[in-house]
């Protein structure tokens, strides 16, 4: 399953905050957003408006363009990994391990 953009942006924002060693409270105060709402945004539960994203980025002193670039790169990696996993799964569908024994039960048909 592909991650939602709001989840990926939330991950990027959380990583930026924790890399700076800052608390949710500090950033929420600086961004003038409730702590609970910022937490929801970081966890990908709420979709942040462009105004809110800008305020959070200002509070973190991280350019919005950097957050969006990081989110795009993260989504591209996740999509690539998902495609690779799907290709491996499809390639393995037709293979039966030599040690695997397939038992096909005998079916008798009764005619009434």
Swiss-Prot record:
This is Transcriptional regulator ClgR. One of its GO terms (molecular function) is DNA binding. InterPro entries: ClgR-like, Cro/C1-type_HTH, Lambda_DNA-bd_dom_sf. Induction: By vancomycin, requires sigE. The keyword Membrane does not apply. Residues 24-43 bind DNA. It holds the Pfam family HTH_3. Keywords: DNA-binding, Stress response, Transcription, Transcription regulation. Disruption phenotype: Depletion experiments (via anti-sense RNA) show greatly reduced induction of the clp regulon (clpP1, clpP2 and clpC1) after vancomycin treatment. Key stress-response regulator that plays an important role in multiple regulatory networks in response to different stress conditions. Probably controls the response to vancomycin treatment; vancomycin induces expression of the clp regulon (clpP1, clpP2 and clpC1). It comes from Mycolicibacterium smegmatis (strain ATCC 700084 / mc(2)155) (Mycobacterium smegmatis). Residues 13-67 form the HTH cro/C1-type domain.
């Amino acid at each position: 399953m592909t991650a939602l953009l709001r989840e990926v942006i939330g991950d990027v924002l959380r990583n930026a905050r924790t890399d700076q060693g800052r608390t949710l409270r500090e950033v929420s105060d600086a961004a003038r957003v409730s702590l609970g709402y910022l937490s929801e945004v970081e966890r990908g539960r709420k979709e942040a408006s462009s105004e809110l994203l800008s305020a959070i980025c200002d509070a973190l002193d991280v350019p919005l363009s950097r957050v969006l670039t990081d989110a795009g790169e993260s989504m591209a990696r996740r999509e690539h990994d998902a495609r690779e996993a799907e290709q491996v799964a499809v390639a393995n569908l037709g293979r039966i391990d030599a040690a695997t024994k397939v038992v096909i039960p005998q079916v008798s048909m009764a005619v009434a």
